[in-house]
């Protein structure tokens, strides 16, 4: 018996002695090559069962994608683990794996079915209808999600949303290149290298006669509008060269060319109102203005307005010490100190009593 563990391959559900190689969705069973040939060659209904390869990495789940870079069939879990490891692995191109054909493992069943089809015309018609039904069912199974019939027995393998983000930018670049090449073939445009600066490649070839007609028409338009453009703009800076227009050459314009060809200002600038020129004063007017300024300066009043007359009178009466307002207590102390000083000064001299 095959030892079935987390690190061993999935054993065949029929013989239990060999490693499985395919997974049958209809039977929800893992089968080896021999058991798959025996089971699905029994009848036509069994041969129409959809089988897919087993993942070559874990060998325990049905394969969902085929990596072209690694040349390996991987299940959804292994695919996400391997291709999310680094940016280089994310660029691998993967495609969904299609079911195995019903004639892959059973040559006997194939020969038998061919003999039956050739010998019996009724069976030939039935076989043709069955093949058409099988093709339609196979296309529907890959375009649409599975129905509720096999939704419970898919062992974590679902078809639908996992195929939405398969083709990464490597394949999209290839598709874009193919589409551009096809578009150029449809338009009959030769692929040439345009190395010259300022040349725009045309996408539609113009015949020689059509080109000559366009050139003549453009010449007539230019000759008729010469005077109008000369009178309005005063130059030929807005005229486009005929050869450059027809051949796809972008005319190059520089500041020096525009200055030489158009000496006057543009129309948009001419329409704007001009700024008033700065007024120049004569020496006499300037002297008169200075005198008026000095007279006004002399007439200015800087008198201090008195809002409260009572406050002004009280401020004048308040005692001051060294020019600052002082309290009554401070004034009394100062007066006593001055009186004591005067007494000390008087006692310094002797008093002569008179008789």
From Swiss-Prot:
Zn(2+) 2 binds at residues 55, 58, 78, 83. Keywords: DNA-binding, Metal-binding, Nucleus, Repeat, Transcription, Transcription regulation, Zinc, Zinc-finger. Residues 252-281 are annotated as: Disordered. GO terms for biological process: regulation of flower development. It comes from the Eukaryota. Signal peptide: none annotated. It is found in: Nucleus. It holds the Pfam family CCT. GO terms for cellular component: nucleus. The keyword Transcription regulation applies. Zn(2+) 1 binds at residues 12, 15, 35, 40. A zinc finger (B box-type) spans 12-54, 55-97. Residues 252-264 have a biased composition (Polar residues). Coiled coil: none annotated. InterPro entries: CCT_domain, CONSTANS-like, CONSTANS-like_Bbox1, Znf_B-box. The keyword Zinc applies. One of its GO terms (molecular function) is zinc ion binding. SMART domains: BBOX (SM00336). Residues 286-328 form the CCT domain. Highly expressed in leaves and at lower levels in stems, flowers and siliques. Not detected in roots. Induction: Expressed with a circadian rhythm showing a peak at dawn. Its main location: nucleus. Putative transcription factor that may be involved in the light input to the circadian clock but does not affect flowering time. Belongs to the CONSTANS family. This is Zinc finger protein CONSTANS-LIKE 1. It comes from Arabidopsis thaliana. The gene is COL1.
